[in-house]
Amino acid sequence: MGLTVSALFSRIFGKKQMRILMVGLDAAGKTTILYKLKLGEIVTTIPTIGFNVETVEYKNICFTVWDVGGQDKIRPLWRHYFQNTQGLIFVVDSNDRERVQESADELQKMLQEDELRDAVLLVFANKQDMPNAMPVSELTDKLGLQHLRSRTWYVQATCATQGTGLYDGLDWLSHELSKR
């Protein structure tokens, strides 16, 4: 009985807990995004060899965000973070046209993973402040997202250094996850 009352109170008054995995190729801006959300400021980053994990509270939701390094040698380790992931944030450098196919390939590999079958997908089309950045429509096409039939997904234009679009993406993510 006590557990039931406790669960009821946490549903009414408590923060909802969500496990989010944030991945993408190296230098896409994952760590910058994480700490912009957590601290509200830009921090100096170095390539992530392993992971950063932080809790980000936003609109009565407690996001546990796992930022996993994106260098090609450590991408096989991504699968160790898949379990219990409710939301997948895939960060793409919109300005890096030479590597967009590599991003698409990595994303498609992840979406085939059984442990991620129920995770909603939020793509952050990052670095939109750059003059050659691909717009959302072009990036959506190059990532092949329009072919995803059995998954909820959304692409949000972002600029991590300015914070533009980050909270819009979290709004979408929290809305989708709250429906589950």
From Swiss-Prot:
Lipid-acceptor residues (N-myristoyl glycine): G2
First-listed, main subcellular location of the protein, grouped into a coarse class: Golgi
InterPro entries: Arf1-5-like, P-loop_NTPase, Small_GTP-bd, Small_GTPase_ARF, Small_GTPase_ARF/SAR
Superkingdom field: Eukaryota
UniProt KW Metal-binding keyword: no
The UniProt record lists the keyword Transcription regulation: no
Subcellular localization(s) per the UniProt record: Golgi apparatus; Cytoplasm, Perinuclear region; Membrane; Golgi apparatus, trans-Golgi network membrane
Keywords assigned: Cytoplasm, ER-Golgi transport, Golgi apparatus, GTP-binding, Lipoprotein, Membrane, Myristate, Nucleotide-binding, Protein transport, Transport
GO terms, biological process: intracellular protein transport; retrograde vesicle-mediated transport, Golgi to endoplasmic reticulum; vesicle-mediated transport
PROSITE patterns: ARF
A GO term, aspect molecular function: GTP binding
Residues at which GTP binds: 24-31, 67-71, 126-129
Membrane topology qualifier: Lipid-anchor
Pfam families named among the record's database cross-references: Arf (PF00025)
Any Gene Ontology CC annotation: cytoplasm
Described function: GTP-binding protein involved in protein trafficking; may modulate vesicle budding and uncoating within the Golgi apparatus. (Microbial infection) Functions as an allosteric activator of the cholera toxin catalytic subunit, an ADP-ribosyltransferase.
Homology family: Belongs to the small GTPase superfamily. Arf family.
PANTHER family documented for this protein: ADP RIBOSYLATION FACTOR-RELATED
Summary of subunit composition and partner proteins: Interacts (when activated) with GGA1, GGA2 and GGA3; the interaction is required for proper subcellular location of GGA1, GGA2 and GGA3. Binds ASAP2. Interacts with NCS1/FREQ at the Golgi complex. Interacts with RAB11FIP3 and RAB11FIP4.
Protein name: ADP-ribosylation factor 5
